[in-house]
């Protein structure tokens, strides 16, 4: 229903549906980034009706010891499945059951090597406003035992060496995100969040082999500025940015 409303040409939404559809669809943007030479985690895209033996043969040929399956269109980790290749080869029904269950809700899925560094080093979430880097945080999962306020440890990203690797990747990503078209004019998005993880192919941290894990539309991504230590004045900056964008598009 929401997709139908957003895609209706009579709907006056911002960012326009075409842009949001690109951001929401990992297959679209990961494919574009790969073809543009932007580092991503090698990815297999499959339908819910996937042939399991064929998929396992492909995973085995890549020598992935562990892998993750994510539904395209899922969010906040919903529907993610984590598997060990050796176990699934011995008992493929576990993977079959996963697709039987989740194909009720999703048409397509992506399959990737499990990156050990995601939990070990966390994920760098970088925020870009008006095409410029503004700030970044790092989130690290907390084991689900005991009570805690937030599901992750969240801190400002201040490591200059890591930022020196991530920011150039982010700049390349912004260049490949399609322009918005609104009121007959082309323009850039107001805010984009670019999330990066280390390390590609489970290389050691010293490799600094960060890659793009996902991107988010800035207005919906969450700024994390309600977390202690994250002090960027996001409300004031975004308010000014959206007013400038409105003036630009409505002139």
Locate predicted features.
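Active-site nucleotide/adenylate-binding loops and adjacent lid/helix of ATP-dependent enzymes
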Residues: 3-10, 17-121, 164-168, 251
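Basic side chains
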Residues: 26, 70, 125, 139-140, ...
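Domain-wide signal for the mature, well-folded portions of proteins, strongly enriched
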Residues: 1-6, 12-17, 190, 200, ...
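Generic domain-boundary/flexible-linker signal
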Residues: 54, 137, 223-226
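Generic beta-strand hydrophobic packing signal
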Residues: 43, 136-137, 194, 215
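Phosphate-binding site of ATP-dependent enzymes
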Residues: 78, 82-184, 197-200, 208-211
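Short beta-strand-initiation
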Residues: 64, 121-123, 189-193
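ATP-dependent carboxylate activation and anion-phosphoryl transfer catalytic cores
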Residues: 142-145, 165-251
